[in-house]
Structure formats: C-alpha cells, structure tokens
Amino acid sequence: MSRSVKKGPYVDPKLLKKIVEMNKKNEKKVIKTWSRSSTIVPEMVGHTIAVHDGRKHVPVYITEAMVGHKLGEFAPTRTFHGHADTEKTSKVK
C-alpha cells in the first residue's frame, strides 16, 4: 500500500535541510545518510548521496528518472555470489 497523497512523500528532515543549503550555495558534495526510506524529491537531482547498505555507504548519483523512488532501492543490501557448484564426479557404470 502506498503512502497517502494527503501526507506527501517522506524525506528525512535533516537530509532535506542539507540538500536545500547546498542548492543555495550551489555546491556538490557527497552526503552520507542512513535514511534508506527517504523518497527522492526533485531538489536532490544532480547530487551524490552515500546511502548506507548495512556495511558501508554506497554513492548514488541522483538523476531525474529516480524522482519518486526511495534511496534504499539504489543501494542493495545483499550480495549474491552464485549457487554452490556441484562436484562433477564421473559415474562408473
């Protein structure tokens, strides 16, 4: 179920404050955040946000196509290394 339109998108207030201040100063620095549930808003376009994946911060460059998605969608938390190989044994008949 999606969030109510009446409430608006959730964006971490501290993260949004940093973005707005950087837009006023016209500077682009990497911003570290643990807020994976924050929605990407148009003010974030062009910035690089380092999103925590549980182990490290993954840098995510925000583009216009990402607006409306969550930050956590672009920082995968699980690493898949493939299934275990079965040993190729020769069967003697």
Swiss-Prot record:
What GO molecular function terms would the record report?
A: rRNA binding; structural constituent of ribosome
Q: Return the Gene3D superfamilies for the record.
A: 30s Ribosomal Protein S19, Chain A
Q: Which domain of life is it from?
A: Bacteria
Q: What keywords tag this UniProt record? A: Ribonucleoprotein, Ribosomal protein, RNA-binding, rRNA-binding
Cross-referenced PROSITE patterns: RIBOSOMAL_S19 (PS00323)
Asked if the Swiss-Prot or TrEMBL record annotates the protein with the keyword rRNA-binding, the reply is: yes
Name a single GO biological process: ribosomal small subunit assembly
Q: Could you say which protein family the record assigns here?
A: Belongs to the universal ribosomal protein uS19 family.
**Cross-referenced NCBIfam families, in alphabetical order?**
rpsS_bact
Biological role: Protein S19 forms a complex with S13 that binds strongly to the 16S ribosomal RNA.
Protein's recorded name: Small ribosomal subunit protein uS19
Q: Which organism is it from?
A: Thermoanaerobacter pseudethanolicus (strain ATCC 33223 / 39E)
